[in-house]
Regions:
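Short, surface-exposed patches at the edges or C-terminal ends of soluble domains, predominantly
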Residues: 1-169
Length: 169
């Protein structure tokens, strides 16, 4: 709470409903008040930070990661390059480079909605994460951004495994 324009009731309400329908307990986290991620947190969801994390939040998230915690990072396209040192430090733990300015635009008209290159129908790759929506045509991305990761050798050194969940043209 406090680092993103999104919350469980604003911008993320559909994700919130979906996760609750899957019998998950969902709660906002005020990491500045607690100074840590709760021990019973199975997955920490981070949504498009609009300011850098302070040291308290960064240390709490890094501690959570180092204890084997799971992160679901959702990021929309950005219009201006920002230097979020602490956000980038957390991303680097997983071999993810800082997010770049710009949105993905589809070039294959058969994968667009209403011939709009900003409304993308991705190819969902099969995995444990996507098995319930694999072969679905109901997934559309708007304002999507590219995720750049380090090369395979660097990922191996970080002990990080990359799994493609979706692909676009």
């Amino acid at each position: 709470t406090g680092y993103s324009q999104f919350s469980l009731t604003s911008g993320m309400q559909y994700l919130n409903m979906y996760l609750q329908n899957e019998i998950n307990e969902i709660a906002s986290l005020d990491i500045l008040s607690t100074g840590k991620v709760p021990d019973d947190c199975n997955t920490l969801v981070i949504t498009t930070p609009n300011k850098d994390f302070d040291d308290i939040a960064t240390n709490a998230i890094m501690d959570y990661i180092n204890k084997g915690g799971n992160i679901l990072w959702l990021n929309s396209a950005i219009a201006n390059q920002v230097d979020y040192t602490n956000v980038n430090k957390i991303l680097a733990t997983y071999g993810v480079n800082p997010f770049e300015v710009g949105a993905i635009r589809e070039t294959d008209i058969s994968k667009m909605v209403s011939q709009s290159p900003d409304l993308i129908i991705p190819e969902i790759q099969y995995s444990d994460v996507t098995k319930k929506i694999y072969n679905s045509t109901g997934v559309i991305f708007l304002n999507a951004t590219k995720i750049n990761v380090v090369d395979s050798e660097a990922l191996s050194n970080l002990k990080v495994t990359k799994t493609d969940l979706i692909k676009t043209s």
